Amino acid sequence: MKKSIPFLLLATLQLSCGSSQEKPEVMQTEEKTIELAPKEILAEAYQLFKEGNDNESVVLAEKVLAIGKETKNDTLIGRALTSLCRNAQRNLDTNRLAELSEGLKLLSETSGNKKWMMYRAHQNAEMWRLVGNLERAEKFYIESMELSSEIGSKGMFMIDHFNKSFVSTAKGDFEEAERLISKYYVLRRELDSTSEDAYGLIALCYLLEQQKNYKGAHEVATVTRRLFKVQNLFPEPPDEKPLLEVEAKVKEELEASLFEEIAKNSTSKS
């Protein structure tokens, strides 16, 4: 398995540079009847969340939730609940997540729309991965992927290959982790053959670090940080946590001179 890592490293680095690219959007197929203002409010709430401003993000999401309930707009209610689920990640508020999850479950039951159960599963998987409960996270990722495959949500199906790879890596199943990362890039090209992605590199550097390939992990982590800075992207909590762990570990394991040399060389790599 180790022999295939350089190829995966090269392929992912080549696919990861270029124009600005957010973490793949997984809510692209909403109803066209959503009012423009609430959509813009939710977009701002998401941006504030990524920047770490959860208080203001929550205020905006709660505003949209109120609008959704008042107008009986299932899409606004579901998207607002999903946004609030993300906000619960920062403080690992699993009680709040459970409350919001019930809201998504009820919405799915009353509307007959399984996508809200898909978002519920995805948000629970993200939280439990962040908490460190790998078995629970994996269970929810599997549920999310089954639902996204069933209802044809290609964006969610793609991104959960990326997400689930962290669980496989942490459990020591490197072969499965590499399969998931490779599949993520295949699915990404199928959705948009022209887009470039920096996000997938987080999964790769975490895999390399867990395999004790500290040089490779440091190189990929450095490129990842540079691309995020250039593209003005903000990793979400479940994804930044392993990146921070990699950065701390490689600094601990590599000699200072080698650490600096790799960092210097990687600043111009793509």
Which residue ranges define each predicted feature?
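Residue signature of alpha-solenoid helical repeat architecture, marking inter-repeat boundaries
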Residues: 35-36, 75, 115, 155, ...
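Structural signature of alpha-solenoid helical repeat scaffolds
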Residues: 32, 72, 112, 152, ...
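C-terminal motif of bacterial Sec signal peptides marking the signal peptidase cleavage site
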Residues: 15-16
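C-terminal non-catalytic interaction modules
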Residues: 21-36, 218-270
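Tandem amphipathic alpha-helical repeat scaffolds
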Residues: 38-52, 78-92, 116-132, 159-170, ...
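Amphipathic alpha-helical segments of tetratricopeptide repeats
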Residues: 62-66, 102-109, 142-153, 182-190, ...
